[in-house]
């Protein structure tokens, strides 16, 4: 059992910033196309974080061409280059699934956290 824990702790990233639900983030993801590798930025609102340790994931939602797009990323994945927090949001829920029902500007209406 300790062997699994030590292997998992070696795989954990050290440079993961503090972010939570309601925050607007930019996720820099490595995309491999044939032999080329490039970085794609996915910007949106974090609607959930779940799991712990090596299996921790977070889901980011954004509106692209009038359609809601959600992507789930493992926090400690080598494909996730970095996560930038652009805006801190203040929410009262752990899971922001109610944003799925909102349309237009209301889909992004989240109070900004006071400093």
Curated annotation (Swiss-Prot):
Keywords: Ribonucleoprotein, Ribosomal protein
Cellular compartments per GO CC: cytosolic large ribosomal subunit
GO terms of biological process kind: translation
Gene3D superfamilies: 2.30.30.790
Gene Ontology MF terms in the entry: structural constituent of ribosome
Protein family membership: Belongs to the bacterial ribosomal protein bL19 family.
Cited NCBIfam families: rplS_bact
Its biological purpose: This protein is located at the 30S-50S ribosomal subunit interface and may play a role in the structure and function of the aminoacyl-tRNA binding site.
HAMAP family associated with the record: Ribosomal_bL19
Full protein name: Large ribosomal subunit protein bL19
Taxonomic lineage: Bacteria, Bacillati, Bacillota, Clostridia, Peptostreptococcales
């Amino acid at each position: 059992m300790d062997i699994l824990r030590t292997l998992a702790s070696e795989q954990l990233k050290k440079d993961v910033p503090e972010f939570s639900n309601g925050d607007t983030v930019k996720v820099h993801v490595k995309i491999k196309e044939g032999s080329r590798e490039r970085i794609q930025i996915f910007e949106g609102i974090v609607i959930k974080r779940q799991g712990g340790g090596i299996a921790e994931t977070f889901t980011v939602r954004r509106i692209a061409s009038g359609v809601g797009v959600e992507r789930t990323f493992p926090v400690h994945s080598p494909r996730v280059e970095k996560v930038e927090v652009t805006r801190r949001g203040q929410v009262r829920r752990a899971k922001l699934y109610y944003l799925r029902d909102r349309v237009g500007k209301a889909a992004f209406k989240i109070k900004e956290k006071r400093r």
